[in-house]
Design a protein with these regions (language model features):
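Conserved acetyl-CoA-binding loop-helix of GNAT-fold acetyltransferases
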Residues: 55-66
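A short, internal acetyl-CoA/4′-phosphopantetheine-binding micro-motif in the GNAT/acyltransferase core
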Residues: 47-54
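N-terminal first-folded block
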Residues: 2-42
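C-terminal structural segments of small proteins and small subunits
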Residues: 68-100
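Short, hydrophobic/aliphatic alpha-helical segments
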Residues: 45, 64-65, 69
Length: 100
């Protein structure tokens, strides 16, 4: 997948909350999933995919990236983003990560 990049940018915020985004870049445009990290909870907030990049399953790629990050770092997830909720409905193997 030449031209693709997944990264996380972090910026500190008050009360030990880290905010950032998981990103995928293609053809000079960036799709992203915004998150917060508070203690051991990863909040998956909002996915944005530029119109030109829609239909390439980037929202699914970003959802999987966020969930894999939570899994590897032993975090729970608080899912607000509808795209991530849709992904979870199709991938129940991640359901144990979701805050109840």
């Amino acid at each position: 997948m030449v031209g693709w990049r997944i990264s996380s940018r972090k910026s500190p915020a008050p009360q030990k909350v880290t905010t950032g985004r998981f990103e995928v870049e293609r053809d000079g445009q960036v799709a992203y999933l915004e998150y917060t990290l508070t203690g051991s909870v990863l909040g998956l907030l909002h996915t944005e995919v530029p119109e030109k990049l829609r239909g390439l399953r980037l929202a699914s790629t970003l959802a999987e990236t966020g969930l894999q990050y939570a899994l590897k770092n032993k975090l729970k997830v608080d899912v607000i983003c509808p795209s991530v909720l849709d992904y979870l409905a199709k991938h129940p193997e991640y359901s144990h990560l979701v805050l109840r």
